[in-house]
A protein has these predicted regions:
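Short, Lys/Arg-enriched charge-dense amphipathic segments
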Residues: 71-89, 144-158, 176-188, 207-221
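N-proximal short alpha-helices
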Residues: 6-13, 20, 76, 80-87, ...
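Short N-terminal secondary-structure initiator segments
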Residues: 22, 26-31, 36, 85-101
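Acidic/histidine-rich alpha-helical segments that form the ligand environment
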Residues: 92-120, 163-190, 200-210
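Short secondary-structure boundary micro-motifs
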Residues: 2-3, 10-14, 88-90, 100-102, ...
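Short, contiguous alpha-helical
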Residues: 4-33, 37-56, 115, 123-171, ...
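A short mid-domain helix/strand-loop element embedded in enzyme catalytic domains
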Residues: 80-97, 104-124, 143-154
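Short, charged, surface-exposed hinge/linker loops at domain edges
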Residues: 2, 45-99
């Protein structure tokens, strides 16, 4: 079965994003739609460990080529960040229970992958050409706080700053986040999100988690060849 893929352009078409509808977090951006598709395909092997952690390796391996099912204009943030910041037409309504459970299983796999990467990479990360860039702990903090203190507010969660940065706090956040999304998807919230939807929230949370996990892998000073010039 082909991989249902969406192309999202920024409002000024400065950058584009290609992402899979069926595999939350498998999403890459580039200057053009063609390059975004090429990069998405190049990340197929990098996404496989997440499918494996979710118990879906066989399904993922059987997936066919990328198939564009929608070509859309996103937001100004798409141009600025090269990231999808709005739901596609397929991600508008509530998810079925089976769809929700599948999405959450893959999101949990993304979390597990992030945690495993964070535990094995070097504390100091390879710097950029001008010597800038965050170290491991700052990447971890940013990733967790963005989800727990920003994304999760869309489904009514509010926690003190930094509360999810401890092991117990992170476990509690993830449990509460999933439950809040489940309740929201079931229609138990009176106040809808302004522009996001549950399918998008799951996809965006998985993407943000994996994007920074892959960043840590790419900048790991303990990885083979890490001391070679880039």
């Amino acid at each position: 079965m082909p991989v249902r893929t969406v192309i999202e352009h920024g409002t000024k078409d400065k950058r584009s994003v290609a992402f899979s509808l069926d595999w939350p977090g498998w999403s890459r951006g580039a200057k053009t739609a063609e390059l975004a598709l090429e990069t998405l395909e190049a990340y197929r092997d990098r996404y496989r460990p997440i499918a494996d952690l979710a118990g879906m390796a066989h399904e993922f391996d059987a997936a066919g080529p990328l198939e564009i099912v929608e070509d859309r204009v996103g937001t100004g943030s798409t141009d600025f960040w090269g990231i999808s910041f709005s739901p596609s037409s397929t991600e508008q309504g509530p998810m079925t229970e089976a769809e929700f459970d599948r999405g959450i299983t893959l999101l949990r796999a993304a979390w597990a992958f992030f945690d495993s990467v964070a535990a094995r990479v070097s504390p100091e990360m390879r710097k950029g050409p001008r010597g800038g860039g965050r170290d491991r702990d700052r990447i971890i903090s940013h990733t967790i706080r963005q989800e727990s203190e920003s994304f999760a507010t869309g489904v009514g969660l509010r926690i003190p700053e930094g509360a999810a940065l401890t092991p117990d706090g992170l476990r509690q956040h993830r449990k509460d986040y999933v439950e809040a999304m489940r309740r929201y998807n079931a229609g138990e919230f009176e106040k809808p999100m302004r522009s996001w939807t549950i399918p998008f929230l799951i996809r965006h949370s998985a993407f943000h988690t994996l994007d920074h996990a892959w960043e840590m892998e790419d900048k790991d000073l303990g990885a083979p060849g890490a001391d070679e010039p880039h």
